[in-house]
Regions:
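Short Gly/Pro-enriched turn/cap motifs at secondary-structure boundaries
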Residues: 1-3, 76-79, 85, 98
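Substrate-binding rim/cap in mid-to-C-terminal beta-strand-loop elements of soluble/periplasmic
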Residues: 1-48, 52-64, 91
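Long, internal low-complexity/basic segments
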Residues: 7, 120-164
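A short aromatic-rich beta-strand->coil structural motif
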Residues: 10-11, 37, 89-125, 133, ...
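WW-domain-binding short linear motifs
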Residues: 67-72
């Protein structure tokens, strides 16, 4: 969930509609790609698709957009050996929860610490920010249908396969 893996460039070319040199600063997620491409193809996406079309953002016609993104990584143990984690990123802050065989939280101020080297989670000066991010994180997990019980289900399923 660190910036080096979270921020991925995307290049699009559609001269009929997209002006050259457009740069988007809004929080776009990979789950927005399919709805956007379907939108350009004039196809209505299925209700099950979680993402949003960012076509209006590319065309500079949309002012309101999400103020946070939810992220989850659950492929542990695996090749990368990165612990399971989920979190939320806003324009300024990032809250990450590592779970499964650990229970660790990280909080970063991306404006003051863009390299994410100073974990502020235990800093009492950031309790109100932490509380606000926890609330938003809970809302987004509910919105996307993620939960601790779902995590436990997948973990137990994985462990049973490994033990057989």
């Amino acid at each position: 969930m660190y910036e080096e893996s979270l921020r991925t460039p995307l290049l699009m070319k559609y001269p009929k509609e997209i002006k050259p040199g457009i740069k988007i600063d809004q929080m776009i997620q990979n789950l927005d790609f399919a709805p956007t491409l379907l939108d350009y193809a004039n196809i209505n996406p299925s209700q099950e698709i979680q993402g949003l079309s960012f076509r209006d953002i590319v065309n500079q016609n949309q002012s309101n957009w999400r103020d946070a993104i939810y992220y989850t990584y659950y492929e542990y143990p695996s090749v990368h050996m990165v612990k399971r984690h989920y979190g939320i990123r806003t324009d300024r802050y990032k809250l990450i929860h590592f779970y499964y065989d650990i229970d660790e939280w990280e909080l970063y101020d991306l404006k003051k610490d863009p390299s994410e080297m100073n974990n502020l989670y235990s800093d009492p000066k950031h309790k109100s920010i932490q509380k606000s991010l926890h609330k938003k994180l809970t809302e987004l997990r509910k919105y996307y249908g993620d939960s601790d019980s779902l995590n436990k289900f997948h973990i137990n399923s994985y462990l049973s396969k490994m033990n057989n």
